[in-house]
Amino acid sequence: MNSMEFPLLDRTTPNSVISTTPNDLSNWSRLSSLWPLLYGTSCCFIEFASLIGSRFDFDRYGLVPRSSPRQADLILTAGTVTMKMAPSLVRLYEQMPEPKYVIAMGACTITGGMFSTDSYSTVRGVDKLIPVDVYLPGCPPKPEAIIDAITKLRKKVSREIYEDRIASQQEDRCFTTNHKFRVGRSIHTGNYDQELLYQSPSTSEILSETLFKYKSSLSSHELVN
């Protein structure tokens, strides 16, 4: 058999020097340490849950799901986002430390899906609330597509310059004309109107009750006679 020789490592220079930049070092350290905050509201999230199994094994990408937004640098939105849940989603995003990323997963998250045509309570795109880095279309997207989206996000992180990212972010994000919140006066004050609970009987009810008693008295008088 032919012997295979591997090149020997150069061990003659113990004082080796690695030349890099702070941006490259930071990007390299964040490539395999993305900690996602899972924000699943619909059936698309079931496809992401399949990545936890041994077939796809998302641990090889360094993904460690976190339950606190203060410990996460990636939020993955999957499913329909309603107007009532929109402030909570924005609050979770604001609590995440910089740099932070967003993956919009599924048609309902990206455009509102089938609920966006005639629903008054559906946000027509999560990018109206928070900036999105990677769009992942599908209804629902397959686990292979999710892995591809994570790979694309890692490539984006590897070529990223931190100062450019901060400058490119939109500071004042607002809703569209159809998605404006209006502060209304609460109708649940805790004080109940006694007049609504105990209403006085109307005149017609009194007359009908009196007539019924009069007829019953006549019938009993006839039976006695």
From Swiss-Prot:
InterPro entries for the chain: NADH_UbQ_OxRdtase-like_20kDa, NADH_UQ_OxRdtase_20Kd_su
A GO cellular component entry from the record: chloroplast thylakoid membrane
Gene behind the chain: ndhK
Protein's cellular compartments: Plastid, Chloroplast thylakoid membrane
Superkingdom classification of source: Eukaryota
MF terms in GO: 4 iron, 4 sulfur cluster binding; iron ion binding; NADH dehydrogenase (ubiquinone) activity; quinone binding
Protein name: NAD(P)H-quinone oxidoreductase subunit K, chloroplastic
The keyword Zinc appears for this protein: no
This protein's UniProt keywords: 4Fe-4S, Chloroplast, Iron, Iron-sulfur, Membrane, Metal-binding, NAD, NADP, Plastid, Plastoquinone, Quinone, Thylakoid, Translocase, Transport
Reactions that this protein is recorded to catalyse: a plastoquinone + NADH + (n+1) H(+)(in) = a plastoquinol + NAD(+) + n H(+)(out); a plastoquinone + NADPH + (n+1) H(+)(in) = a plastoquinol + NADP(+) + n H(+)(out)
UniProt binding sites for [4Fe-4S] cluster: 43-44, 108, 139
Mode of membrane association: Peripheral membrane protein
PANTHER family: NADH DEHYDROGENASE, NADH DEHYDROGENASE [UBIQUINONE] IRON-SULFUR PROTEIN 7, MITOCHONDRIAL
The record's free-text note on cofactor binding: Binds 1 [4Fe-4S] cluster.
Principal EC category: translocase
Main location: plastid
Subunit and partners: NDH is composed of at least 16 different subunits, 5 of which are encoded in the nucleus.
